[in-house]
């Protein structure tokens, strides 16, 4: 196993202990101090994120496995996002499947029932390797989600050569629980017994350390965990059944027992008897038992008199469950094997790694002149790009209606919507923008929060909480670290502006290609919101198109610039425009003025028109009504924020309301049932082949 500890960190350990640590102790420290578990290179900046609010029940508190917010009627929404990037690059099926399993266990560790999954997938070009990665990632997610009966209700699928060697596989999960029944992940008192459910095997050895370094391609398959959704279903059902009988619950994720026990003890101590751990193979060494990341395991802190009843529930399913130790008052974590010490380290040492603040330097951005491209060529290239095609092939692999609570299904709108037990509608959306982040990570951080907020508004919802996942290259590289800092600053600023608390998140560094080049910065947010009033149900029909918001000539960091190069200006995020435009859309939904709507983002106005054209309708646009720039390419492909495209029978209402609110809204054209074509001013662009590509590209390419 490769240790990721630096020489300085190893000296700190030796100095604190006053001795040379044993091999097992080095592995223990390596797991707890890994970037994956400790956030040692990011924690200083993560503290700037707003994490409190009137509805927040549980937020970014140390060692809590998920955040929770009040959604009324005595219920709490539990929210979490995770990734399995490195494992998915090595074994995409199991890497993706175990990512789903892990996040489900994070949700049930709060005593919450999982009600919805989202998957945000980013892969490179669709060559043989890319096809293999994507097909197996999709299969892995579907295999686990479908088997345990949790619907995959939405997500993203993006293609960019920056992810050729290092795909990004993000999974988010929402759960629901009585707010008085939330279970903590940490304990407050000694004397509790540590109960472990599930077998421990050899898979996932050193997974936390593996996730905290660049991929080397050498002997890494053993660090990938193996998925068993049928065991996962037992874990989910029994954990929810016994949640009220236990004092704390923790998933055995990164770092295995080493991390779960130490974090659950939360500064107290623990004694673990490794010979009591149920093993899948008899020949596991004590050191491997400590750091194994075998899936489908949970750790419970239980009062002594409740141990037997807790384990009895698992044994009804012939599922292993054993009392393996206890929480102690002495602040020391001890792992024993048949009474002999294997590792014995102070809790403070394990929970207090030296924090890093690396040198940071903003990368010079070359402002290239804008490219001159024929409009027809630009339309074909942008509208046939894989990022904009129908993702039906992907979401058809998932059972998105299991549980019967899914209201807005994948492909039906900009946000997924599920019905909560109290009758309210919960909207969920994940957003990232690697192109904009590669140009300006600060503006990107603001923009992805604003886009998620707008996406929720398209179904009539207003955001109430978000979680983030910050995915970058090696933080020791100054340009990478500066992008990370800038992205956090942008996310923090936008979240504060919209009064949306960040209740959880994850940081994933060391995402690089085989040559050591970092991926484009890819921070991602997943926002949850509640529908205010009416729920929008999009339908395309004949009517007037209204563009809300101003279109600036901002083509740098867009899909257009990725395809054609060149640049121009980077889109500036104007949060007040996003807020006011979202308010107008929600008002329009509640007053019955909207038949179809979409936020304008990827692919610009042209990209927003594509779903209408794909339904067999014609669109006639007057470019003079798209105000803010005289550049026709800017009008069609700029990804300026604060904009919505609305289909309505009452365009005057929108123009009047927008004027009162201080923003722009103009009728820019009409939709007619006249075959798929785009008429821009006096030029007609047939769309039949583009529409055919829209529906056939993904399945045909695989």
UniProtKB/Swiss-Prot annotation:
Molecular functions (GO terms): ATP binding; magnesium ion binding; phosphoribosylformylglycinamidine synthase activity
Q: What is the top-level taxon of the source organism?
A: Archaea
Name one process (GO BP) from the record: 'de novo' IMP biosynthetic process
Q: Binding positions for Mg(2+) 1?
A: 82
Q: Where does ATP bind?
A: 39, 80, 468, 505
Q: Report the catalytic activity.
A: N(2)-formyl-N(1)-(5-phospho-beta-D-ribosyl)glycinamide + L-glutamine + ATP + H2O = 2-formamido-N(1)-(5-O-phospho-beta-D-ribosyl)acetamidine + L-glutamate + ADP + phosphate + H(+)
Gene Ontology CC: one annotated term: cytoplasm
Keywords attached to this entry: ATP-binding, Cytoplasm, Ligase, Magnesium, Metal-binding, Nucleotide-binding, Purine biosynthesis
Query: What residues form the catalytic site here?
Result: 36, 84 (proton acceptor)
* Coiled-coil segments: none
Provide the protein's localization.
Cytoplasm
Question: Which sites bind substrate?
Answer: 83-86, 105, 225, 293-295, 508
* Enzyme Commission number(s) of this protein: 6.3.5.3
Could you give the subunit structure recorded for this chain? Monomer. Part of the FGAM synthase complex composed of 1 PurL, 1 PurQ and 2 PurS subunits.
Job of this protein: Part of the phosphoribosylformylglycinamidine synthase complex involved in the purines biosynthetic pathway. Catalyzes the ATP-dependent conversion of formylglycinamide ribonucleotide (FGAR) and glutamine to yield formylglycinamidine ribonucleotide (FGAM) and glutamate. The FGAM synthase complex is composed of three subunits. PurQ produces an ammonia molecule by converting glutamine to glutamate. PurL transfers the ammonia molecule to FGAR to form FGAM in an ATP-dependent manner.
- Its protein name is Phosphoribosylformylglycinamidine synthase subunit PurL
């Amino acid at each position: 196993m490769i240790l990721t500890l630096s020489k300085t960190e190893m000296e700190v350990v030796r100095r604190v202990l006053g001795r040379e640590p044993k091999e097992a102790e080095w592995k223990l420290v390596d797991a707890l101090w890994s970037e994956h578990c400790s956030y040692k290179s990011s924690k200083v900046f993560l503290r700037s994120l707003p994490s409190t609010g009137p509805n927040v029940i549980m937020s970014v508190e140390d060692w809590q496995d998920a955040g929770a917010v009040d959604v009324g009627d005595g219920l709490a929404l539990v929210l979490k996002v995770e990734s399995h990037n490195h494992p998915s690059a090595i074994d995409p099926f199991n890497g993706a499947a175990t990512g789903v399993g892990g996040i489900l266990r994070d949700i049930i560790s709060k005593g919450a029932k999982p009600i919805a999954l989202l998957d945000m997938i980013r892969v490179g070009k669709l060559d043989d390797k890319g096809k293999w990665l994507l097909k197996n990632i999709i299969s892995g997610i579907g295999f686990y989600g479908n088997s345990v009966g949790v619907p995959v209700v939405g997500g993203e699928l993006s293609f960019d050569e920056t992810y050729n060697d290092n795909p990004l596989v993000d999974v988010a999960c929402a759960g629901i629980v009585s707010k008085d029944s939330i279970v903590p992940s940490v304990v407050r008192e000694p004397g509790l017994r540590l109960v472990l459910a599930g077998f421990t095997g050899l898979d996932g050895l050193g997974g936390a350390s593996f996730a905290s370094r660049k991929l080397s391609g050498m002997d890494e398959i053993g660090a990938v965990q193996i998925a068993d959704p049928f065991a996962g279903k037992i874990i989910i059902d029994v954990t929810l059944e016994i949640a009220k009988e236990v004092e704390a619950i923790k998933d055995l994720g990164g770092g295995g027992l080493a991390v779960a026990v130490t974090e659950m003890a939360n500064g107290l101590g623990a004694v673990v008897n490794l010979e009591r751990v149920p093993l899948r193979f008899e020949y596991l060494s004590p050191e491997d038992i400590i750091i194994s990341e075998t899936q489908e395991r949970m750790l419970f802190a239980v009062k002594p008199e409740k141990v037997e009843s807790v384990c009895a529930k698992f044994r009804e399913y012939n599922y292993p469950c054993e009392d393996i130790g206890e929480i102690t008052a002495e602040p020391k974590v001890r792992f024993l094997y048949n009474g002999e010490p294997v590792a014995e380290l102070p809790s403070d040492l394990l929970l207090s790694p030296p924090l890093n603040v690396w040198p940071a330097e903003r990368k010079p951005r070359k402002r290239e002149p804008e490219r001159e491209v024929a409009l027809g060529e630009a339309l074909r290239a942008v509208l046939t790009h894989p990022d904009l095609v129908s993702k039906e092939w992907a979401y058809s692999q998932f059972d998105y209606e299991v549980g019967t609570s899914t209201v807005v299904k994948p492909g039906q709108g900009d946000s997924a919507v599920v019905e909560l037990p109290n009758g309210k509608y919960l909207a969920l959306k994940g957003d990232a923008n690697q192109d904009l982040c590669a140009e300006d990570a600060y503006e990107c951080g603001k923009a992805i929060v604003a886009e998620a907020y707008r996406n929720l508004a398209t179904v009539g919802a207003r955001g109430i909480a978000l979680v983030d996942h910050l995915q970058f290259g090696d933080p020791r590289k100054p340009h990478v670290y500066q992008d990370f800092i800038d992205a956090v600053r942008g996310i923090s600023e936008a979240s504060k502006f919209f009064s949306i608390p960040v209740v959880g998140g994850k940081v994933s560094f060391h995402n690089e290609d085989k040559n050591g080049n970092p991926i484009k910065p890819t921070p991602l947010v997943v926002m949850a919101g509640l529908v205010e009033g009416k729920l929008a149900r999009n339908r395309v029909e004949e009517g007037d198109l209204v563009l809300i918001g101003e279109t600036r000539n901002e083509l740098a960091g867009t899909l257009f610039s990725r395809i054609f190069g060149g640049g121009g200006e980077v889109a500036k995020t104007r949060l007040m425009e996003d807020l006011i435009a979202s308010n107008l859309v929600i008002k329009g939904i509640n007053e019955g003025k909207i038949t179809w709507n979409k936020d304008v983002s990827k692919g610009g106005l042209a990209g927003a028109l594509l779903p209408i054209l794909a339904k067999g309708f014609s669109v006639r646009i007057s470019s003079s009504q798209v105000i803010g720039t005289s550049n026709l390419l800017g009008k069609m492909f700029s990804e300026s924020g604060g904009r919505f495209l609305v289909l309505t029978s009452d365009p005057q209402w929108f123009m009047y309301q927008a004027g009162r609110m201080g923003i722009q809204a103009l009728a820019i054209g009409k939709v007619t049932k006249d075959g798929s074509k785009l008429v821009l001013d006096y030029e007609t662009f047939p769309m039949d082949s583009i529409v055919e590509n829209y529906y056939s590209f993904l399945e045909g390419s695989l």
